[in-house]
C-alpha cells in the first residue's frame, strides 16, 4: 500500500537508489497504490553516472510491497520492503536493463511483460 510521501527502493539498474512517491496515478482522488500500479516519483538518492539523477520526476510501477497482494486461492504474497521499477515518462517502458529481486505474477499484463522477462524470479 503506497501513498504520497512513501519512500521506496528501486529494483533496477537505472542509477536511482531511493525514490519518493509524489502522486498515485489512476483517478482523481485515488489514495493508495498496490503491486502493478503506476505512480509518479521523484528521485531522492542516486548513484553517480547513472541514467537518472537526483530530483528527476518520473513514472514507476510498484513491484513489491510490505502490505502484499492477495491471490484468488486465499494466499498472500508479502515482501520485506517497498520497491518499484522506473519507467520512461512517455513510452512507460523500463529505464533499466536489469531487475533485482523477485516480482509477482500480478505484473503479467501487456504493459509489463518486459519487466517479467527481465526479473530473475516471478512469484
Curated annotation (Swiss-Prot):
rRNA-binding is among the record's keywords: yes
GO biological process, one term: translation
Pfam families, per the entry: Ribosomal_L14
Cellular component GO terms, alphabetical: cytosolic large ribosomal subunit
Metal-binding as UniProt keyword: no
Keywords noted in UniProt: Ribonucleoprotein, Ribosomal protein, RNA-binding, rRNA-binding
Molecular function as annotated in GO: large ribosomal subunit rRNA binding; structural constituent of ribosome
HAMAP family found in the cross-reference section: Ribosomal_uL14 (MF_01367)
Subunit and interaction comment: Part of the 50S ribosomal subunit. Forms a cluster with proteins L3 and L19. In the 70S ribosome, L14 and L19 interact and together make contacts with the 16S rRNA in bridges B5 and B8.
Cited function: Binds to 23S rRNA. Forms part of two intersubunit bridges in the 70S ribosome.
Similarity-based family: Belongs to the universal ribosomal protein uL14 family.
Full protein name: Large ribosomal subunit protein uL14
Organism the protein comes from: Edwardsiella ictaluri (strain 93-146)
Amino acid at each position: 500500500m503506497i501513498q504520497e510521501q512513501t519512500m521506496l527502493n528501486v529494483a533496477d539498474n537505472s542509477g536511482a537508489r531511493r525514490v519518493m512517491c509524489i502522486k498515485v496515478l489512476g483517478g482523481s482522488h485515488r489514495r493508495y497504490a498496490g503491486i502493478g500500479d503506476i505512480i509518479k516519483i521523484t528521485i531522492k538518492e542516486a548513484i553517480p553516472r547513472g541514467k537518472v539523477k537526483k530530483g528527476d520526476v518520473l513514472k514507476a510501477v510498484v513491484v513489491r510491497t510490505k502490505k502484499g497482494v492477495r491471490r484468488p486461492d486465499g494466499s498472500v504474497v508479502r515482501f520485506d520492503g517497498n520497491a518499484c521499477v522506473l519507467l520512461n515518462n512517455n513510452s512507460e517502458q523500463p529505464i533499466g536493463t536489469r531487475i533485482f529481486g523477485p516480482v509477482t505474477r500480478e505484473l503479467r499484463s501487456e504493459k509489463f511483460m518486459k519487466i517479467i522477462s527481465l526479473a530473475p524470479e516471478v512469484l
